[in-house]
C-alpha cells in the first residue's frame, strides 16, 4: 500500500560482494506513521476493504527490507530482530509446489485470482529477503529456499507459475497471474522479481543467470510500451491506458535507475531520466492524474 508520504530512493550497492542494502530505500515506512499492524510475532498484516486484515507476502517483505537497511546503517539490534522475524515467516510459510516453493496469498482477489494465489513480486522480494539473511548468517537453508522460489518463474501461468509473455513472446513475470484473462504485465512487480533474481545471482555464484538474462532482454525490448509520452504506465492493458500514480511513477524511476546500474543496460537509465523529466512538468502530472481517474472509473481498483 502506497501513501502520499512515499519517497522512493534508489540505493546503489558498492562493488563489494556480500552484505548489501536493499535497492529501494523503504526506511521512510518505519518513521512516517505507516500502518504495519504487527501480530503477536512481530509480523505485519495488511488491511483490505474486501477481505479484512490478511498476511501479504509483499507487506512482510517490505517490513523486512526496511528494517534491514536501517540495521545496516545503524547496527540496531531491534531492527535486526525485526528483520529476522520476517525471515522466520518466509521460512515457515514457504509452501512446496513441485520442485519449488511459493508464498501464497490466502484470499480471493478481483479479476479471477482464487485462494491461494501467488505473485512474481512476492517470490522476488522473498528471495531478496532470504539472500540477505544468508549473507549475514551463511545458513544454507535460507539460500536453498531462495533457489527453490525461482522455480515458478520458469512455469507458465497455465502451469501454475507466474511466467507470462509480451506480444512478441518475450518473458514477463506477472504480479497478478490471472488464469482466465490476458496478462496485465504490471511493471513494478516484474522489476521487484528481477531484483530477486539479481540477488540470487550475487549470493549463489550465478544461479538463475539464464532466467535473469531472458527477463532483462525481454524488458529491454518491451520497456518502451510502458511510456505514455508524458508519464509511465502502471501496467499494459487493452483499452484505456492506466497511468501510474505519482508514487508508482517515482518507484518506476528508482527501480530502473538501480536496474541500469546492476545490468549496465543503458535503456534502463535513459528511460528513468526521461520519466523523471516528465514528472517536472505540471501539465504532465495533471494529465497523468486525469488519466488515472478515467481508468479507475472504468476499471475500479480492487481493494
Q: What is the role of each PLM region?
A:
Residues 1-303:
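Glycan-recognition and catalytic cores of secretory/periplasmic carbohydrate-active enzymes
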